[in-house]
Amino acid sequence: MKQSLLAKYKNGPVTVTIYDDGTKIREWDDEKYDIEPELEFPESCDVKITNFCEGSFLNNDGLYTVCPFCHEGSSPSGKHGNLEKLSDMIERSNLPEGIEFAIGGGNPLATPGIEKFLETEAKSRNHIINVTMNYNHISPNDGKYRQQTIDYLKRGLIKGLGVSVMYYNLENFLNDKELQDVSSNIVIHIIEGINSFYNVKEKLFNCEWRHPKVLILGKKNFGRYGMLSEDKKAIDDKQTTIWRENILDFLKEFNGVTSFDNLALERLDVLSKLPKEVVDTQYMGKDGSHTMYLDFVKEEYGRQSTSKDRKPIGDKTFREIYKDVYQHRKEWK
């Protein structure tokens, strides 16, 4: 499938180009500027808009319940963020077209006013909205939000879809051709440690989906996960070790596209295993260099979703928050 240009803009010394398959290119004069040059505004904003989730984890009794490893603690009693307030904040921030917003939760498509928000930000303001959903919410069998998701993708309200999977539904998702055909930017979300390395490898390497995209996420040892037994955590830690020991071979053998969040890069020690030229040209930088995190349920912000240090959003703009995050990114916990 041929790439189509979604956005191109200048952010301080950096030229940013984004294509419809999710490819992002950042270019600057590295002889004149640092490896993480200071920008005028954030290029990608991770925004939690809800803590509501009906329950998307299939337990041993065959029932759906809340995910036991959810660091957000999302549940059927979780609260929603105010999307009108978020949209107003985006407008006041005077951001150029093409800024990426990674919208998550909880279940983001259950948030009141979500369609109006997407129409405003994706269509009227031409921002790039990426949404993360649990596959059980959008599966062809009983996924309550499947048609809504497909409709939003076809209408361009969502440009990228991240799909969280587990061992019991990964194969079903890999065979979901209807969903795969809707967009060239559908990404499988895999949590290392939680998901078995060998199960993931077997399913991915033997599926018919050509060049699947995978985002490997670092396991977060807090939130609901922190309440699990030490025995369960020990089992997951062994899985993390297996991921760490085999990740380089996985990258060499996999015929798709693999990316990592910064936590996974750290926990699996990925950067030290890669050639310098690969790191120099493909590593997108640390959290806070051109990104930021908002919890719009609690109306707080931080450097990243795992940040313990949070500050109230108040009446700040995205530009003001980014400046604060960037200037304090090295000491921000």
Residue ranges of predicted features:
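Alpha-helical scaffolding segments of alpha/beta enzyme cores, especially the outer helices
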Residues: 88, 113-123, 148-151, 202-203, ...
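Radical SAM enzyme [4Fe-4S]-AdoMet core and its adjacent flexible, acidic
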Residues: 159-319
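Core AdoMet radical
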Residues: 44, 52, 71-83, 96-111, ...
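Flexible mid-to-C-terminal extensions adjoining Fe-S/redox cofactors in radical SAM and related proteins
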Residues: 2-17, 21, 38-43, 293-333
